[in-house]
Design a protein with these regions (language model features):
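Residue-level signal for alpha-helical context at structural boundaries
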Residues: 63-64, 88, 125
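A short, conserved alpha-helix in the catalytic core of glycosyltransferases
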Residues: 33-50, 56-76, 81-82
Length: 134
């Protein structure tokens, strides 16, 4: 119902295309950037970059930060469009927080892999380290 009423964005991401040659022809295996709403990464890789950078404020760029640091680590970003289906409900877009754009540009220049405020700084209610539980 959501797709018919126009509430679903990116309807092309809801179609399963299991045949790799057709996915190539349709350019489904190319990505502009990694979206935080639908991706997976090996635990060891996420730990190596210290997860999401908690220094980002407001809206936007934190998923691109993860993508860049994974690439700086030497990983190639791939796409599962047509294989891992995604339903994205429409919502109004928010403005990106300008300080996040600045932070992302600095990351591009520095080629940094590990963030300061990531998994290793997370604690539970009793103050115990959470990174070791991931």
């Amino acid at each position: 119902k959501s797709a018919l009423s126009g509430e679903t964005e990116f309807l092309n991401r809801t179609v399963r295309v299991p045949w790799e040659p057709l996915r190539r022809v349709l350019r489904m295996n190319r990505i502009a950037d990694m979206k935080g709403c639908n991706y997976s990464v090996a635990r060891s890789s996420l730990l190596a970059i210290n997860g999401f950078d908690e220094e980002y404020e407001g809206y936007g760029r934190e998923d691109t930060d993860v993508e860049l640091r994974l690439q700086h680590l030497g990983l190639e970003i791939g796409s599962l469009k047509g294989v891992a289906l995604q339903y994205h409900v429409w919502h109004p877009r928010r403005e990106f927080t300008p300080v996040n754009d600045t932070r992302l540009e600095e990351l591009k220049r520095s080629k940094r892999i590990h963030c300061r405020q990531g998994l290793t700084t997370l604690t539970d209610a009793e103050g115990r380290d959470l990174a070791s539980k991931i």
